[in-house]
Amino acid sequence: MLSHKKSLDILKKTNALLEGHFVLSSGLHSSKYIQCAKLLSYPVLAEKICKSLANKIKKKYKKIDLILAPAMGGVIIGYEIGKLLKKETIFCERVNGKFTLRRGFNINKGSKIIIIEDVITTGKSSIECSKLVTDNGAEIIGYACIIDRTNGKSNIKQKIVSQIELYIPTFEENKLPKSLSLIHI
């Protein structure tokens, strides 16, 4: 398995770790942003990270029926993990603000499912995907991602399996530190 340091070096090498002023999908502000699409543009390096994450998932979960990834960020990572674990992989996408299964995908009742994302910050997308799983009578056995930046403060109750844990402070718009407020978005 790749070490945290080697994984972080790959993020830096692929210019996936950006610095500046960013508004995250959660609406929170941050001085750093992880653009996993940059990592994924280097398939050999992305495969190394995904292989290491897949090994962690395999160690923790013995019975996986299906991998579910939220579009857009989780699709390629979900596919790569599914390939490595030899598991069916599907994705859900937002329609009118709600995650939905389309394109003929379905979730079988009783299936044991792992939700895989690129980056988890607040856990909002994962929790929304969870509802889709439980509404279909399936069971979420775990969550996994390339980068966990929750610092243990997400709405996800289970331990997240990740390749990289990064604590990057986030701020509400009305509580920005001066140094961040001076950087234009």
Describe each model-derived feature in a short phrase.
Residues 1-60:
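Active-site-facing substrate-recognition patch
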Residues 4-10, 130-183:
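PRPP-dependent phosphoribosyltransferase catalytic core
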